[in-house]
Amino acid sequence: MDCAITKDVEDMLRKFDSNGDGNITFDEAVKRLKETGSKDPLRAASSMFISLDKDKDGIISIKEIHGHKADVAAKKLQKAINNICNNFLKGYDTDKDGRISWDEVCNWVNKNNPDAIAPLMIVENFFSELDKDNDRFVTKCELQEYVTKYKSLPEQ
């Protein structure tokens, strides 16, 4: 588990778990929200339980808090990957069909690296890294798989 997520979970428990049992009850949530000046503590607690009490037992457990924090982190990561891939597509996908063709990469290399000693090798390397179905097109899905695996895209 990510250290930041663990710290967030511990902070939340410390603030809301008044009896120290490692769980947050609805009453504990309402009490804490009142103490912090919430305008509508019942509504805020209800919202909190809708989001966090996955098994609907009326108690938010440390496991549920960890799961929620991990879900939020995963969504942020997926959004970042999506943004990286969209920006990468913008740089190469000149015909705006949502994929990068062999010709688009050749044109990009010739335009942006005119002194390249082996431009065809650059294009071949690009496609060998990204084009998993060998159709001479790189799709957003292929970009996302690559970024998810390697945390970046190849540089040209």
UniProtKB/Swiss-Prot annotation:
Ca(2+) 3 binds at residues 93, 95, 97, 99, 104. The keyword tRNA-binding does not apply. Ca(2+) 1 binds at residues 17, 19, 21, 23, 28. Residues 4-39, 40-75, 80-115, 118-153 form the EF-hand domain. The keyword Methyltransferase does not apply. It comes from the Eukaryota. One of its GO terms (biological process) is cell motility. One of its GO terms (cellular component) is cell trailing edge. GO terms for molecular function: actin filament binding; calcium ion binding; calcium-dependent protein binding. Keywords: Calcium, Metal-binding, Repeat. Ca(2+) 4 binds at residues 131, 133, 135, 142. InterPro entries: EF-hand-dom_pair, EF_Hand_1_Ca_BS, EF_hand_dom. Pfam families: EF-hand_5, EF-hand_7. Ca(2+) 2 binds at residues 53, 55, 57, 64. PANTHER family: CALCIUM-BINDING PROTEIN (PTHR10827:SF85), RETICULOCALBIN (PTHR10827). This is Calcium-binding protein A. It comes from Dictyostelium discoideum.
